């Protein structure tokens, strides 16, 4: 059974495919139109704006903090009763170095503020911080999806793997322009 959506899709596999297609198109627009550059890096408000932009055509809850507890496998994300204070604490975390930015990214992943679409939204949120704070972005084509998911799963306990993976995929913005 699929999450309730604006498209009336009831098959979860079909919804996942459609969601990926639409959100990738919207992500591209977010970068190409310069909308992303108008947002403040590293805030939960910015993450909500990114999520809303990516998923507003699909879900009514786009850009809204979740109102239910969620888990993936055996991992429970931040409980609802602590979610708002977790987001406030994440907003206050420093973001002036690669390590600080990744630590903030890991904490946001643990918070998982949305019912669906957290990964796509937070990766864009991460790239915005990296771009504005240290002049780099992740070349996601250089990141093995399986290695990334395993590293993210372990990151709340030990973030060295995710830092290593992402540091090796950084692209210097001055080389792009």
State where each predicted segment sits.
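FIC/Doc superfamily catalytic core
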Residues: 1-177
């Amino acid at each position: 059974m699929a999450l309730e959506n604006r498209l009336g899709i009831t098959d979860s596999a079909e919804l996942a495919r459609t969601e990926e297609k639409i959100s990738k198109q919207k992500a591209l627009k977010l970068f190409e139109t310069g909308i992303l550059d108008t947002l403040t890096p590293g805030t939960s408000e910015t993450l909500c704006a990114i999520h809303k932009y990516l998923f507003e055509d699909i879900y009514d809850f786009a850009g809204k903090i979740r109102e239910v507890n969620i888990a993936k496998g055996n991992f429970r994300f931040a409980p609802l009763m602590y979610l708002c204070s977790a987001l406030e604490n994440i907003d206050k975390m420093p973001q002036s170095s690669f390590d600080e930015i990744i630590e903030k990214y890991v904490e946001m992943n643990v918070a998982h503020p949305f019912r669906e679409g957290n990964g796509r939204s937070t990766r864009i949120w991460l790239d915005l911080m990296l771009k504005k704070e240290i002049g780099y972005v992740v070349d996601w084509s250089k990141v093995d999806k399986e290695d990334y998911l395993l590293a993210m799963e372990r990151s709340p306990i030990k973030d060295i793997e995710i830092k290593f993976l992402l540091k090796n995929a950084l692209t210097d913005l001055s080389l792009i322009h």
